[in-house]
């Protein structure tokens, strides 16, 4: 069975090797004119400076948490326990590495995309450069995630003999190691998403509010001092943040599936049901194998699009990459399921929760794959200007900004229903065919081809940057037309990616919650989270409000940083003679510093709350309160994230619909366009800061709670004072 780990490490190394190959391939391309090189260098320096400062803050937080873990688990196990802390550090390193590499390639690829468009005037060739750059981020997400899991298995599972059946029945250290590895990934994801989101939207709003709305100059105009900061933000928020986010979801889903397999086994043993050590081993390896197959499928899907002849339809090419990866994953997953579980004793399969025989976990995982594609399609319908919802926002803009906002709110709210129906069906059917393990496998299935989806999502900000460089370098209009078309498709893929991220986060959080319940309840007992229990109900009420508090803090953080940016841009327009005539250069460096300082200052409190809140709640009120807290927060956050992501995406593409000339007499600079710009500006922090951060909030809360579940049960204030557990 251990030989299956060879498939995992081979898939990880193939992905990282192909990522390195594409990284080198992109860097070999020419950067273009001296002006293009100058702008690209400024973006690169700004992005490097921000992520360096951010990682220094993360390092301090990580050291504190690692020391705390060592102390907590030493108390819990009665002997010095360093293993969970080391696994936590491995998770931090893997997630930080993926984010750093992704940000690096984005700052190299952007100018090369612009130059390819300038030289070829061909959208197909330009798309390939952007996708090749995006694939580096996508492949690193899958590669580093599986590499870290492989290290945890090899070092702790086999090296320290934690996978021994007696060890699993005893202290459960291996499952704690997996939880801590997932938490390490979560910490980096939270800081990258929150910090990057505040940075990018503060710069974006500052550039738009003064540049477009007041000075009436085009987007990415070189006269606007906030333009460089805006382009830096695309890299630190939409590339590094996105990659860390989905890497964390990927790891969380796999880890929770493995932990659930162990919990189900121990529960069956406690109930004297017929169980098999070999069956446990197969269930512990199956999530890893399925994820490895998905990673290989993603490599094939990306390679096919990069190697085939380019077309003038970028949306179709990107869909081919994603759908082919999904299809190969389903087929390969069936083969793996057949080889692992076919021939297993029917009674043992039934005890494990496999209600439709050996094929049960494959059905659950495949359902996750399909539901991910469907949720992405729903997001596309509500955010692409090819469809009615976004077109109605553009039409409403003819009557002013108030109706733009109102119509966008309507679209965002209505867009919540169908993804939740899909998630509800997926959750129930997965449970029906394969029990709690099936829900975890649905999350693994949805994320199995994550490298393909992240590659497509990262292509968007790279194309957006390329358009900015083309505009600031004053390249011919045909170049901007190509980059604008790629950017428009990128906005839709970004909305699809956000829907995919929150969908996968909800399934991952649900399986982590189940693992949390197993962690502190007596082995063999039925899982019980009864809402007639006032502790659970109180926790759910508080949890339902928490995403709104968190979102409000993020929006306020963006507003505070954007206000400083607006003041600086206005000052430069007022005090630097000739800047609006193009005779003087703006001071872009000051704007970059404002965004960096604002993001680094404002990100701390939301990030800390997401980690500390469940800990304080657990030690005050115990694990049942925390269980309610997690359910309330998850349900609330899912709906809020879908609403903010789709409303913001629809406002953005509604503006682009007007810019495309689709509404007669209402192009750039028209009253309808001015109203649409207001909608786009309002939607920016919603879709790029709030929405993406909410899915990390529910995952990090679930992971922190899982790690500390036993401590909550044994050492909470209610128990110490009143004896209530």
Each PLM stretch: what is its role?
Residues 1-725:
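Hydrophobic packing and interface segments
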């Amino acid at each position: 069975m251990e030989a299956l780990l060879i498939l995992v490490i081979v898939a990880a190394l193939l992905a990282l090797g192909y990522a390195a190959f594409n990284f080198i391939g992109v860097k070999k391309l020419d950067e273009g004119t001296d002006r293009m090189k100058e702008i690209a260098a400024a973006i690169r320096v700004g992005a490097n400076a921000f992520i360096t400062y951010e990682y220094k803050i993360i390092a301090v937080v990580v050291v504190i948490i690692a020391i705390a873990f060592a102390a907590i688990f030493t108390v819990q196990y009665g002997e010095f326990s360093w293993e969970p802390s080391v696994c936590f550090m491995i998770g931090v390193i893997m997630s930080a590495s993926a984010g750093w590499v992704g940000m690096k390639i984005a700052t190299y690829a952007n100018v090369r995309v612009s130059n390819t468009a300038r030289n070829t005037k061909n959208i197909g060739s330009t798309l390939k450069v952007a996708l090749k750059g995006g694939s580096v981020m996508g492949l690193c997400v899958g590669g580093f995630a599986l590499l870290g899991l492989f290290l945890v298995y090899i070092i702790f599972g086999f090296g320290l003999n934690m996978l021994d059946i007696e060890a699993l029945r005893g202290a459960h250290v291996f499952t704690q190691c997996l939880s801590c590895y997932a938490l390490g990934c979560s910490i980096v994801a939270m800081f990258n998403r929150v910090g990057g989101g505040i940075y990018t939207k503060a710069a974006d709003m500052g550039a738009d509010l003064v540049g477009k709305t007041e000075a009436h100059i085009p987007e990415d105009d070189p006269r606007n001092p906030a333009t460089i900061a805006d382009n830096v933000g695309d890299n630190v928020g939409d590339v590094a943040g996105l990659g860390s986010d989905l890497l964390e979801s990927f790891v969380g889903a796999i880890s929770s599936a493995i932990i659930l397999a162990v919990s189900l086994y121990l529960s069956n043993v406690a109930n004297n049901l017929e169980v098999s050590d070999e069956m446990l081993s197969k269930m512990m390896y199956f999530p890893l194998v399925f994820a490895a197959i998905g990673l290989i499928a993603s490599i094939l899907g990306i390679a096919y699009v990069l190697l085939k002849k380019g077309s003038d339809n970028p949306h179709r090419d990107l869909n081919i990459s994603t759908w082919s990866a999904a299809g190969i994953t389903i087929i390969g997953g069936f083969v793996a399921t057949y080889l692992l579980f076919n021939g297993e004793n029917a009674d043992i399969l039934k005890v494990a929760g496999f209600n439709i025989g050996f094929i049960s976990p494959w059905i659950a995982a495949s359902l996750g794959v399909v539901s991910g594609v469907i949720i992405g399609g729903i997001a596309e319908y509500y955010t692409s200007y090819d469809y009615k919802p976004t077109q109605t926002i553009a039409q409403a803009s003819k009557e002013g900004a108030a109706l733009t906002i109102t119509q966008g709110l309507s679209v965002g709210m209505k867009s919540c229903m169908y993804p939740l129906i899909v998630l509800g069906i997926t959750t129930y059917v997965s449970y029906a065919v394969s029990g709690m393990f099936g829900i975890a496998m649905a999350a693994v299935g949805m994320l199995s081809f994550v490298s393909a989806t992240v590659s497509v999502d990262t292509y968007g900000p790279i194309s957006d940057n390329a358009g900015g460089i083309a505009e600031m370098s004053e390249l011919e209009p045909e170049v901007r037309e190509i980059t604008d078309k790629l950017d428009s498709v990128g906005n839709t893929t970004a909305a699809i990616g956000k829907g995919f991220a929150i969908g996968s986060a909800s399934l991952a959080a649900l399986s982590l919650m189940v693992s949390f319940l197993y962690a502190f309840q007596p082995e063999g007992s039925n899982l019980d989270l009864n809402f007639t229990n006032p502790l659970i109900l109180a926790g759910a009420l508080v949890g339902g409000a928490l995403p709104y508090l968190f979102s409000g803090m993020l929006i306020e953080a963006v507003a505070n940083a954007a206000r400083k940016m607006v003041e600086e841009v206005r000052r430069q327009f007022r005090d630097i003679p000739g800047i609006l005539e193009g005779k003087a250069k703006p001071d872009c460096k000051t704007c970059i510093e404002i965004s960096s300082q604002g993001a680094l200052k404002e990100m701390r409190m939301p990030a800390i709350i997401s980690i500390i809140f469940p800990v304080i709640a657990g030690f005050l009120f115990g694990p049942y309160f925390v269980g309610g807290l997690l359910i309330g927060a998850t349900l609330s956050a899912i709906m809020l994230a879908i609403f903010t992501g789709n409303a913001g995406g629809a406002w953005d593409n509604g503006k682009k619909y007007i810019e495309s000339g689709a509404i007669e007499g209402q192009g750039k600079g028209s009253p309808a366009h001015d109203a649409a710009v207001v909608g786009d500006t309002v939607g920016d922090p919603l879709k790029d800061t709030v929405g993406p951060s909410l899915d990390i909030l529910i995952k990090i809360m679930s992971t922190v709670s899982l790690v500390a579940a036993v401590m909550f049960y044994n050492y909470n204030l209610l128990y110490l004072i009143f004896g209530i557990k």
